[in-house]
Amino acid sequence: MRSSTISASAVVLLSGLASAQTFTDCNPTEKTCPSDPAIGGLQVTDFTAGKSSYWEVEDGTTMSYDGTLGAQFVISTATDAPTIKNIGYIMFGRIETWVRASAGTGIVSSFILESDDLDEIDWEWLGANNAEAENNFFGKGNTTTYDRAQYPAVATPIDTFHNYTIDWTAKSTIWYIDGVAVRTLLYDDKQTVGGKNYPQTPMLVKMGSWIGCASKAAETDSATAGTCSWAGGAVDLTQGPFTMYVKNVTIQDYGCATEYTYGDLTGDYTSIKATGGCSADGSAASPSASSSSAASGSSSSTKSSSGSSTLSTVTGTTSAIAVGTATGTATLSAGEKATAAAISGSTTSSSTIAKVTTTSDANSLKKPKHEYGMIDLGVMVLGLGLGYLVM
């Protein structure tokens, strides 16, 4: 994500998105910080079914949900920066989402992975560019250069939903659009400075939209001119509202934990401690996926109409991050079941996300169902027989 020196008020305004490389509540490379709650398995969110308990709404954010278009991130005024964040972290993983970016010069739509020590992996879209998406990364908050971004072509990302995927492992990070790899970043790529700037610490998924250039004056202000140039110029709010849409998000945590802890101040992935075992409601997949499964949604153009219904409206308040009810159960929505089924059984790609059952949980995490074969049953019977003889 493009960053520049910004005022304290702007930091609040951008709700943690634009300032991602320069701010963290507690930096584990500087001091001991609290452990991060882990997703620890597969999490599926279907925003066309309404609000999800697996996402927290940031202060000042009002969200609406549409039965066709999903979550709506709306900018109408200069102080709007709608943002939501997941309740859990991943330690390497695969993240897929169906997004239709917001229009509007100066408007930025963002989908990012961010860690406590300022590692970051991005998908972003500029409202003035209806032909490209942007992918980027940062390590340990290093913003000394802005030469890491790439802009792969994508057909009308502002008018059309597309599948955007990040597959993140200790060896590489791969960005996909509609199942096609558009960038591969190796751990030891020259831009990572021998791996030092390679993102490698527990990540939290955030998404939202924000104003990259608030006014004509900002275009010439030395503190904001760089971001204004990147965002395409000043926003004209009279042309709004400007809306980013997200249909769904699928997160596979490759770690096996209920929480992740930094073992020292290095920020190296080998120092991260995973504790608690896999989630009681999900199991991590192998971190070797090689392509994207365009499982849910459609690549065809989707237009908003006056007939579409808003399911609900939610206003954000501050709350602590929590893993949720790992042992609790709840009924999945029809949309979540369909999404999970598509991911596990009806894709044509070589995604290694494990096949899962669609029995429920409070975090859309699915636990693989164990099946016993004849040999297993035979061993059980033999064991019971021997136990009887001993008695």
UniProtKB/Swiss-Prot annotation:
Pfam hit, one = Glyco_hydro_16
Reactions listed under catalytic activity: Random endo-hydrolysis of N-acetyl-beta-D-glucosaminide (1->4)-beta-linkages in chitin and chitodextrins
Q: What does the UniProt record report as the effect of altering C33A in this chain?
A: Impairs homodimerizatuion and transgycosylase activity, but does not affect the induction of host cell death
Gene Ontology terms for molecular function: glycosyltransferase activity; hydrolase activity, hydrolyzing O-glycosyl compounds
Disrupted-gene phenotype: Does not affect development and only slightly increases sensitivity to Congo red. Leads to a weaker plant cell penetration ability, associated with impaired infection cushion formation.
Q: Where is the active site?
A: E120, E124
GO (cellular component) term, any one: side of membrane
- EC number of the protein: 3.2.1.14, 2.4.-.-
Positions of the propeptide removed during maturation: 361-391
Where a lipid (GPI-anchor amidated serine) is covalently attached, the residues are: S360
What residue range is the signal peptide? 1-20
Q: Where is this region: Plant cell death-inducing domain?
A: 93-127
Localization of this protein: Membrane; Vacuole; Endoplasmic reticulum; Secreted
Keywords from the named record: Cell wall biogenesis/degradation, Disulfide bond, Endoplasmic reticulum, Glycoprotein, Glycosidase, Glycosyltransferase, GPI-anchor, Host cytoplasm, Hydrolase, Lipoprotein, Membrane, Secreted, Signal, Transferase, Vacuole
Which ranges carry the GH16 domain?
A: 29-246
Chain intervals for the UniProt region annotation (Plant cell uptake domain): 21-74
For the ligand (chitin), the binding residues are E124, K206, W210, T227
Cystine bridges: C26-C33
Q: What GO biological process, any one, is recorded here? A: fungal-type cell wall organization
Q: Which family does it belong to?
A: Belongs to the glycosyl hydrolase 16 family. CRH1 subfamily.
In the record's own words, the domains note is: The region from residue 93 to 127 is sufficient for the plant cell death-inducing activity.
Q: This chain belongs to which protein, by name?
A: Crh-like protein 1
Could you tell me which species this protein originates from? Answer: Botryotinia fuckeliana (strain B05.10)
